[in-house]
Amino acid sequence: MDNFPNKTYKVIYADPPWYFKSRSEKGEGRNPNQHYDCMELKDIMNLPVKDIADDNCILLMWAIDPMLDKALQVINAWGFQYKTVGFTWAKTNRTNLGFFTGLGYWTRANQEMCLLATKGRPKRKAKDVAQLVVEPRQEHSKKPLLHKKIEKLVDGPYIELFARKKPFPNWDYWGNEV
């Protein structure tokens, strides 16, 4: 993942490729490193995100339950202060309206959180952006498209870090799959 951006953004949207060991009766096929290149925590923390964050910036970062404490470390390392959960994705099954039941160390996981952190005093545009997102689960780690919700919530410029595709022309994207 070269060519880190060299301009500043008011919104940074990130889905870090966390490296962690998972246990599954189905084997390593559910482990993230079987699907994409993962990064160690120290490498994620050392990315120069501080350099691209505007003085008044929002960070929206996906975090899986077992990595929540690590996600908070990343937020701090990148120069942000945790505020709240920005979005909660309740996963449904692909073929019916029932909720998806995933893995879990204590309880079976269904949701993923997108944490919201700030630097400075960014301005919120709308007060009616819902936190809950109910959408079908897709291929491994693919998140629902929240870009329009984010655009309604705050003004850009916008960047998605660790992006896989470029779905919206008014966003910048960085990652080894774009």
Tell me the role of every PLM-derived stretch.
Residues 1-178:
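Class I S-adenosyl-L-methionine-dependent methyltransferase catalytic core
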